[in-house]
Amino acid sequence: MATKFSRKTFLKAGAAGLGMMALNVCTASAAAPQEDANCLDFLFKKQKTPKTTYAGTRKTLFWYSETLKQDCNYSVYLPASYDENNKAQAYPVIYLMHGVGGHQLNMIERFSTPDILNDLIGSGELPECIAVFIDGYNSFYYDGPGLAMETAIIHDLIPFIDKTYNTLASKEGRIIGGISMGGYG
């Protein structure tokens, strides 16, 4: 059975509280400025303690890119209910891209994205989902001289993720977001 979610809710939280959610938070704060004058603080502060007891798992692994002819780093967040043997349960996927000079762990360590996902899923604001943290090197996530990163993501990484994990393997089951260079890609 596939996870049911509204496209609006999934898009709102698509970047696990980063870019797109910042716009929503700031818009809400602008309507009620007395509540939160620094609506972007969550982007720059490491969240110390998760607000819920919900806990997904995170792994750092490699995928082989035929396009790039090399192994590439990625990290994955799996929801607490994830069972690789339960092919009937499919999850939407959030693809997250780091900024220039970084790597996929920046989205995890600097921004505490797994904690944000745990809080959003645990509170019911986001359906259970898989998050993939892409290492884009300094490619700006497009096909440039010497590194066809956009092609590698589209033709190699996404099919690899769909084959490896129980995903909603369609455009309706995917969203992509990032910060800085990752927002450009």
State the predicted function of each range:
Residues 12-22, 30-185:
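Non-catalytic cap/lid and distal C-terminal segments of serine-dependent acyl enzymes
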Residues 5-6, 172:
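Intrinsically disordered, low-complexity sequence elements enriched in Ser/Thr/Gly/Pro
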